[in-house]
Amino acid sequence: MAPKHDGFKDFVLDQFSGLPCLTHRAMFGGYGLYCGSVFFGIVHKGRLYFKANETTARRYRERKMKPYRPNATQILHSYYEVPVDILEDAGELTLWAQQASSL
């Protein structure tokens, strides 16, 4: 069976042209984002999530962003949805990705 085309994933990858270490792999019905061997992001159901710690998660919560929910019963508080304004600004998105990949 041919893989399903994912326009959102393609958009996200295009936005990361300033991050040469970026690779991605299909996983859990979405895609995992890596910088080298470091797993730092998730593309799932038309949303982008970055790895966060206690300090950086505050920045996401202040913008009313939610943690990653792979299903109705599970919440991963170590990954938060990236705000749309950041997603649309390739330079800012790269900075946020670099921070997420350094955690």
Which residues does each predicted region cover?
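Charge-dense, helix-prone N-terminal extensions
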Residues: 1-103
